[in-house]
Amino acid sequence: MKRYYFTLALIVLLLGLTIWFNVPGHPQIKIGNFERSMDLIQGLDLQGGVQVLLEADLPAETPIDPQALEDARTILENRTNALGVSENLFQVAGERRIVAEFPGLSDPEKVLAVIKETGLLEFVDLQDNPENLQEGNLILTDFGQTSTSTQPTETTTAPATEGQESLASTTVYHTIMTGKDLKSVVVSRNPNTGEVVIDFTLSDEGAKIFDEYTSNNIGKILAIVLDKKIISAPRVQGRIPSGQGQITGNFTLETANNLAIQMRYGALPIPFKVVESRVIGPTLGRDSLQKSLLAGYIGFTIVILFMGIYYRLPGVMADLSLIVYALITLTLFRFIPVTLTLPGIAGFLLSTGSALDANILIFERLKEELRAGRTFSQALDLAWKRALPSIRDSNIATLITVVILFIFGSQFGATIVKGFAFTLGVGIFVSLFCAMVVTRTFMYILVDRMKPQAKHLKWFGILD
């Protein structure tokens, strides 16, 4: 029995921690570089926000590498995180689309300015700029067609095609290097003029290329081009061996920050277009949340009363275990963290049924063993042993369904299905722990302390 008292002490400690993390004004977790706010994150349908649907801006017959789509998702997520937009969610939807959700955000333009651009940064050799190209002009470059080098090449003229009316020139200019050679990017102000500028430092390889180019092309124009648009076209004044440079232009602090983010996190491997952008109001979500919580409270209360009335003392132990289950699950939702949506709340409430289902199987088996004349200790041992296969098989079947739903939600961007499956899955694992450890510990200690006899059978739900 000593191990059950030791387990009880651990359960009490765990219960104290979960209460600590779930009371108002709960603390943050900070261990070294690891930090977690422990806030309960609400999804779009609960607090409103912005939802954006992006689609690959390529011909329908062009195949898209799934890894490129996943890389694009990661880059977009990093960009918006750098903007300070927290709790965002990016999911690949099918073979050509990405769904982005920003709970709590009311202005879509803040993120659209960053996520809709490809972010391909190029350092382009304009030589003497014979065509008098200016900032804002669209040009053609040979990046992706030939390997980059520091040697100036003869420019060629690309045949005019449909969609190139806005090009300032049909000449194809040579790309010296790209944004992948950047090591760091910082937005600052010129101390003399107050102008917003972007300071950058190149990698070792990029610094060598930059040094060689500036040494051989003093007096020439080196354009800094983003998505084929010239954003700055400085003249090389001298050799730059340090690998450090500065981008100037008509920047505001916001546009400079957006550009720096695109430079910092790299170019998208696939160009995207915004198919749909919509703002979702929080009013309906708040109303739905209040009704869902009310339904949950009512259901929770009815279940607790039923278990206590029908199963008596074992039911009370199950009720205590159910409270532990709820606190552990909510703490996990805060820690992981899980973005709670209405379907996610439904999954959580449904998993409470699994928690009670295991207890009911055990208690019914316990009643059978007691009716057969077993002692309370023997009945407890046999009840858990014989109920375990049924509990295991039913939960495995549910978990298989959860996995299928989660994969389906991930594959097709069905965040509603994915959220439901995830919260249900977490709840099932916690419910198994509570049934097989928490309730069992409570029951063994109850029997040890109470030392019940045959006259106490009614307190274990046996009325006949």
Swiss-Prot record:
Annotated spans, Disordered: 144-163
Compartments in which it is found: Cell membrane
Annotated InterPro entries: SecD, SecD/SecF_arch_bac, SecD_1st, SecD_SecF_C, SecD_SecF_C_bact, SecDF_P1_head
Compositionally biased residues, Low complexity: 145-162
Domain of life: Bacteria
Gene Ontology CC: plasma membrane
Protein name (record): Protein translocase subunit SecD
